[in-house]
């Protein structure tokens, strides 16, 4: 059996890591296509080595652009790749423009399409990710859902017969990374002289929070007003936006820092008092590590983190400060995202449903 995985952004490569391992263990031929949707200096050889990801077989080098330009460029390039490899499955990951392009190319050329992380819904149609994930689910021959909530969304949309719950592959990666750290010191703590448990780790990147200068300024001011240091792992795009509008990302308690490699990020979150983010991935990672999280959004796809008390949605400066300052949540043994073996189930389901 042959699978072609299409990925283009760092979170997708993290999800790819356990899939690559499981495919190799099952003797499945696995072709990795890197669209180059996001230029990310963290996607270095070290990143691939740390997570055990094989080097991509194909680099498209699409780069940045508007949603239409980027999606169209990826779509145009994928047609020839799929025809060359004639896969038994095209595997699309998550909710990026690379995801949507892979879906459209696969179905137009009549190659079976599987969607990993299917069924997630924010119900916010302003988010480009929401369009991408909904369209990909409805194009897919097999929807690989991470949670029971996601399965419910798929059933509600008439996709129950083509859906299966496998768990969350991010859980696989996180548990492996956590265990490999085994009490090792955090690079961030050592570099900045931080006291473990007495600082917050933050990431802010969504357009709703960064494209409007007034919105970005009020978030920065709120984080800067907190009692403990807030280390903002700022993407170059956010740094450029802030600089263009005279917004200081190092003010009060707020300290801007470059993004971290995945193992270093997990070590930093483990050492922190809490996480503050608008990222879907970090909300879930914080929950799995049992680190409190504040999400600067009015909604989340990962509703289990909120229902179990480890994540609070906060959209105004006042809500952000109150949420970050809240007491530690009640302990829970709940495991809504699986047991760390989702990738094995993904490969097993692809083999089982092979046409």
Q: Where would I find each of the regions flagged by the language model?
A:
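Nucleotide-sugar donor-binding patch of glycosyltransferase catalytic domains
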Residues: 287-331
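Leloir-type glycosyltransferase catalytic cores
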Residues: 48, 149, 312-355
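A nucleotide-sugar donor-handling region in carbohydrate enzymes
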Residues: 38-42, 61, 139-211
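A donor-sugar binding/catalytic signature common to diverse glycosyltransferases
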Residues: 92-93, 143, 267-305
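Active-site and donor-binding regions of nucleotide-sugar-utilizing enzymes
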Residues: 4-7, 13-24, 47, 59-158
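Donor-nucleotide binding loops and adjacent catalytic segments primarily
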Residues: 37, 45, 65, 182-271
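Short acidic-hydrophobic, aromatic-tinged amphipathic segments that line or gate anion-handling sites
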Residues: 60-61, 145, 165, 256-258, ...
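Glycine-rich phosphate-binding loop signature in dinucleotide/nucleotide-binding domains
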Residues: 81-88, 194-195, 271, 353
């Amino acid at each position: 059996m042959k699978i072609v995985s299409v990925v283009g952004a760092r979170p997708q490569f993290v999800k790819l890591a356990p899939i690559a391992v499981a495919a190799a263990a099952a003797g499945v031929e696995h072709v990795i296509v890197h669209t180059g949707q996001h230029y990310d200096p963290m996607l270095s050889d070290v990143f691939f080595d740390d997570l055990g990801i094989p080097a991509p077989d194909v680099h498209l080098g699409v780069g940045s652009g508007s949603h239409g330009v980027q999606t169209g460029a990826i779509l145009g390039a994928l047609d020839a790749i799929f025809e060359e490899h004639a896969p038994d499955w095209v595997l699309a990951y998550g909710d990026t423009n690379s995801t949507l392009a892979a879906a459209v190319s696969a179905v137009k050329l009549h190659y079976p399409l599987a969607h990993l992380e299917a069924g997630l819904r924010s119900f916010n149609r302003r988010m480009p990710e929401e369009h991408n994930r909904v369209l990909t689910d409805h194009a897919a021959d097999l929807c690989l859902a991470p949670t029971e909530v996601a399965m419910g969304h798929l059933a509600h949309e008439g996709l129950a017969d083509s859906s299966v719950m496998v768990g969350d592959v991010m859980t696989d990666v996180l548990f492996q990374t956590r265990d490999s750290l085994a009490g090792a010191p955090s690079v961030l703590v050592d570099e900045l002289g931080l006291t473990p448990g007495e600082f917050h780790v933050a990431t802010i990147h969504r357009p709703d929070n960064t494209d409007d200068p007034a919105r970005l300024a009020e978030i920065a001011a709120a984080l800067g007003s907190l009692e403990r240091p807030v280390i903002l792992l700022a993407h170059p795009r956010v740094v450029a936006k802030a600089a263009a509008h005279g917004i200081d990302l190092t003010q009060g308690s707020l300290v801007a820092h470059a993004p971290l490699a995945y193992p270093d990020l997990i070590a930093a979150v483990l050492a922190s008092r809490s996480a503050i983010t608008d990222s879907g991935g970090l909300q879930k990672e914080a929950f799995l590590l049992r680190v409190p999280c504040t999400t600067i959004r009015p909604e989340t796809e990962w509703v289990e983190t909120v229902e179990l008390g480890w994540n609070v949605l906060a959209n105004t400066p006042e809500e952000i400060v109150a949420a970050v300052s809240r007491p530690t949540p009640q302990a829970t043994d709940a495991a809504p995202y699986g047991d760390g073996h989702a990738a094995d189930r993904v490969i097993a389901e692809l083999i089982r449903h092979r046409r």
